[in-house]
Regions:
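C-terminal capping/lid region of NAD(P)-dependent oxidoreductase domains
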Residues: 206, 291-306, 313-332
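NAD(P)H dinucleotide-binding glycine-rich loop of Rossmann-like/cofactor-binding domains
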Residues: 33, 45, 56, 78, ...
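Glycine-rich phosphate-binding loop and adjacent beta-alpha segment
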Residues: 219-296, 324, 331-332
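Glycine-rich beta-strand-centered segment in the early N-terminal region that forms part
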Residues: 21-39, 50-92
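NAD(P)H cofactor-binding loop motif with strongest signal on the N-terminal glycine-rich segment
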Residues: 147-148, 216, 239
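Short amphipathic alpha-helix with an adjacent loop that forms part of the alpha/beta core around
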Residues: 195-206
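Mid-domain Rossmann-like dinucleotide-binding core that forms the NAD(H)/NADP(H) cofactor-binding site
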Residues: 118-120, 124-194
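Short glycine-centered segments of the SAM/dcSAM-binding site in methyltransferase folds
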Residues: 84, 142, 166, 232-233, ...
Length: 332
């Protein structure tokens, strides 16, 4: 089958189109004809060998897919051929077919096309799990969302507003800031301005925010700690700024604050010890919550652009140059 192939560690744009063996159907799995696949900043790290998880080479990158079931193993009764599904997989999304354990496959909500299903898996799954399950964000709390113009950040803004929180969002372009206001952010800051603590404290009357949603890391993390109110929580979910910060715990003591990590990949088996089976109830709960957001209209998955597989380099350029407002999707 045709696929985008990573044979050795290299930049995403330097990968090559090629052929990969058609995966074998195994007990407990379904075969999916892939119609759309998501790529992200993390996809680039994976193919460069810089991610914490290193697939055996050669492999096709891509972990978020949507498509139609074309075959099911004899012991699978949750799905049948023709079902519209989505899944977060180990790798292999940028290919024509994938064979996936049925326990990590979910129906595509009614009314969404193939590309629109992609943000639900990582962007909305990460944000729902982090804000609802981990931070326990409550109505009336202030939440500061960094990187709010990207897929994960947009989802965090929508979910926080749905929960009744007050949102301060940061983004780097006029277009992104306008979209965030449209989606309900109470205050939108220019992320090109290095100092965000001053306006955050002004907006909150000197109190600070209850929750920080940080997908950037680096200096943003350190300044964010100083934006927390007493008893505040800082969610660290990624390091798109490139630097993994270290923590001086004295500030946690002074503010009675909590720093908490959230790795959505843990729920899908992306850890040294594969926990996907044990964590199925928690994963199902998050995905049910995400589907509920779509049904209620609280979530409007935003796809920035859709590219054919042949234009994979152009697709990733949108991410590398930070032009994407929402998700980038490739159709294999």
């Amino acid at each position: 089958m045709r696929a985008l192939v990573c044979r050795d560690w290299r930049p995403f744009e330097a990968l090559e189109l090629g052929e990969m063996p058609v995966p074998e159907l195994r007990p407990g799995t379904v075969r999916v004809r892939i119609r759309a696949a998501g790529i992200s900043f993390a996809t680039g790290l994976v193919v460069e060998g810089k991610y914490q998880r290193k697939p055996p080479r050669p492999f096709a990158p891509g972990t978020e897919i949507s498509g139609e079931v074309i075959e099911v193993a004899s012991d699978v009764d949750r799905f049948r051929a023709g079902d519209r599904v989505m899944a977060f997989i180990d790798w292999g999304g940028l290919a024509e077919e994938a064979v996936i354990w049925a326990g990590q496959v979910y129906p595509v909500p009614e009314g969404l096309d193939w590309p629109e299903a992609i943000p639900l898996l990582s962007s909305y799954g990460t944000s729902f799990g982090a804000l609802v399950e981990r931070a326990r964000l409550m109505a009336g709390e202030w939440v500061l969302v960094h990187g709010a113009g990207g897929g994960v950040g947009l989802a965090a803004v929508e979910i926080a507003k749905h929960l009744g929180a007050r949102v301060i969002a940061r983004a780097g372009t006029d277009e992104k800031r306008a979209w965030l206001k449209e989606r309900g952010a109470d205050h939108v800051l220019d992320s090109r301005e290095a100092d965000f603590k001053t306006p955050v404290m002004e907006i909150t009357g000197g109190r600070g925010v209850g929750v920080v949603y940080d997908s950037l890391g680096g200096e943003v993390f350190h300044q964010s700690l100083r934006c927390l109110e007493i008893g505040g929580r800082l969610l660290t979910i990624g390091y798109a700024a490139g630097e993994i910060p270290t923590l001086g715990v004295n500030l946690l003591l002074l503010k009675n604050a909590t720093v908490m990590g959230f790795n959505w990949g843990t729920y899908w088996g992306w850890t040294p010890v594969d926990e996907r089976v044990r964590l199925t109830p928690e994963r199902d709960r998050v995905m049910a919550g995400v589907a509920g957001l779509v049904r209620s209209g609280a979530a409007r998955p935003r796809v920035h652009a859709v590219f054919p597989l042949e234009r994979f380099a152009d697709a990733f350029a949108e991410i590398r140059e930070r032009r994407a407002l929402g998700r980038i999707v490739i159709t294999p």
